[in-house]
């Protein structure tokens, strides 16, 4: 009887081809069972719907892949009712056991699973037959989180390694030149020009005791150029130390713009001495002078690009901190002045409102019927961060990647293999850091207003929040936040 029933079960599978390569038998935790009826698998993506009141727009966020569930039908069949009951009990105990277990299934193969639910059915007139429906999920293989590189800390460390390598390159490649010759004059002019560029960058940082000290050091260096050009180690140490001093003077906001300016200046100097393929194009007759000047301009450009990449990473850290502070900041309007009577209802037309990008003052009615000025202050946005949206990060990442690629190619063409390797590692870290952490910033969208609206109303219409209306006005170059022109494309940062 048992063999007849098993053959009948397998005959159904054979009609559809399901039993040609499988036996129709399986095990769970080494407890055998027979596979019958349908076997199901389900999966998909974990989507979260974003729907807002009074808005016809919305969307979904993809939170990743769902775990694949497997549901299969099994049975215990035996010619002896007591034996069938014992075998069914053993399978129930295996399904109830804690932890994961090995499932051997003719369709699913051998997989390590955990049981989500199971159901057993039997009939009073068929005590030798037990039908099961079991749902399982794949067990977790990794019991610890994946290790990730702290890119925000790795970028400054790699920047130190790059600048050290650049200093070694300058001191090892530099050749002495004879005093009083045209070659010496050309080299001194090149070094003096580099010092002047650094001095201009420092001069733009303001007037403080630290800035004055660095300016004094640069002036002393400029006065001793004649001796420095024949002391390669001292020259390299002085120039790299000056760049390090500039980096230490800048805060996270001014650092990125400062290194942008320096990189552009050094880029022009480098382009004037080396062609696209690294061919020296200077007009000097001395090969030594040509080589020295080309190496000097390459080292200064590579160092500036290195510090700019480090500044971008630090600016992103500051932007994320700023975003977290703004999320936790109080959002209530603040009264600029005590609530005093400044007029009557009939004199409301004489009151005025002062509008700036940093502050919006509106007239409010006091409890006694007078008027007072209410200020919606842009707390913390007087000095906005360098990066405010994912689009800012994408543009900066592309710019830094292209700039570092150019410097890496120059290093390879001139035979500076150590510099090339260090710069390549820096580029990989910077791009990974900006792309990974930059996703935490808000996204930006482009919209057209149907009509002229105040910035607060326009921002609320597209985001449901008008707290950062000053940012909308600033980033779109709107001089009067009360009048955002309709029909014009504006950038909206949607948090």
UniProtKB/Swiss-Prot annotation:
Subcellular location, record wording: Virion; Host cytoplasm
Keyword hit for DNA-binding: yes
Annotated stretches, region: Disordered: 331-353
Gene Ontology MF terms: DNA binding
Chain spans, region LysM-like: 444-493
GO cellular component: host cell cytoplasm; virion component
InterPro entries xrefs: DNA_circ_N
Swiss-Prot/TrEMBL keywords: DNA end degradation evasion by virus, DNA-binding, Host cytoplasm, Host-virus interaction, Inhibition of host innate immune response by virus, Late protein, Viral genome circularization, Viral immunoevasion, Viral release from host cell, Viral tail assembly, Virion, Virus entry into host cell
Bias (Low complexity): 339-353
Primary location recorded for the protein, binned into one broad class: virion
Single Gene Ontology BP annotation: symbiont entry into host cell
Signals that turn on the gene: Expressed in the late phase of the viral replicative cycle. Expression of late genes is activated by the viral late transcription activator C.
Top-level taxon of origin: Viruses
Residue ranges: DNA binding: 407-426
Protein purpose: Required for tail assembly of phage Mu and responsible for circularizing the viral DNA after it has been ejected into the host cell. Following infection, the circularized DNA can be isolated as a supercoiled, non-covalent protein-DNA complex, in which the protein N is bound to the ends of the DNA. Protects linear double-stranded DNA of viral genome from host exonuclease degradation.
The protein, known as: DNA circularization protein N
Gene: N
């Amino acid at each position: 009887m048992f063999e007849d029933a098993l053959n009948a079960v397998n005959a159904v599978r054979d009609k559809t081809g399901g039993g040609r390569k499988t036996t129709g038998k399986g095990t769970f935790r080494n407890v055998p069972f027979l596979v019958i009826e349908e076997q199901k698998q389900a999966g998909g993506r974990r989507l979260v719907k974003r729907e807002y009141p009074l808005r016809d727009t919305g969307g979904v966020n993809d939170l990743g892949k769902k775990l694949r569930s497997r549901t299969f039908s099994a049975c215990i069949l035996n010619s002896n009712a007591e034996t069938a009951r014992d075998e069914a009990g053993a399978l129930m105990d295996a399904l109830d056991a804690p932890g994961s277990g090995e499932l051997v299934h003719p369709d699913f193969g051998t997989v390590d699973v955990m049981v989500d639910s199971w159901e057993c059915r039997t009939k009073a007139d068929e005590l030798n037959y037990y039908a099961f429906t079991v749902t399982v999920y794949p067990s977790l293989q990794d019991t610890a989180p994946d290790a990730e590189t702290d890119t925000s800390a790795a970028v400054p460390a790699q920047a130190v390694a790059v600048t050290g390598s650049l200093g070694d390159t300058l001191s090892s490649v530099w050749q002495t030149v004879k005093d009083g010759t045209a070659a010496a004059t050309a080299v001194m002019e090149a070094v003096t020009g580099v010092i002047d560029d650094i001095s201009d960058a420092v001069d733009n940082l303001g007037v403080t005791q630290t800035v004055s000290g660095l300016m004094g050091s640069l002036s002393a260096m400029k006065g001793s150029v004649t001796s420095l050009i024949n002391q390669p180690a001292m020259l390299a140490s002085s120039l790299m130390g000056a760049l390090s001093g500039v980096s230490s003077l800048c805060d996270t906001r001014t650092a990125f713009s400062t290194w942008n300016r320096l990189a552009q200046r050094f880029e022009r100097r480098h382009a004037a001495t080396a062609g696209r393929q690294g061919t020296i194009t200077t007009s000097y007759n001395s090969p030594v002078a040509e080589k020295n000047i080309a190496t000097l301009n390459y080292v200064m450009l590579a160092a500036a690009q290195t510090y700019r990449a480090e500044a971008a990473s630090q600016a992103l850290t500051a932007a994320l901190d700023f975003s977290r502070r703004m999320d936790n900041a109080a959002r209530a309007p603040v009264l600029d002045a005590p609530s005093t009577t400044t007029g009557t209802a009939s004199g409301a037309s004489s009151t005025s409102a002062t509008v700036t990008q940093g502050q919006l003052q509106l007239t409010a009615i006091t409890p006694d019927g007078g008027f007072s000025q209410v200020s919606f202050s842009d707390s913390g946005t007087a000095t906005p961060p360098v990066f405010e949206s994912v689009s800012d990060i994408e543009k900066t990442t592309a710019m830094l990647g292209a700039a570092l690629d150019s410097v890496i190619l120059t290093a390879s063409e001139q035979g500076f293999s150590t510099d090339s390797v260090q710069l390549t590692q820096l580029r990989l870290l910077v791009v990974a850091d900006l792309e990974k952490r930059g996703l935490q910033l808000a996204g930006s969208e482009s919209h057209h207003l149907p009509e002229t609206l105040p910035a607060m109303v326009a921002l609320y219409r597209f985001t449901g929040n008008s707290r950062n209306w000053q940012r909308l006005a600033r980033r779109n170059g709107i001089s009067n936040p009360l009048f955002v022109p309709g029909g014009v494309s504006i950038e909206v940062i949607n948090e």
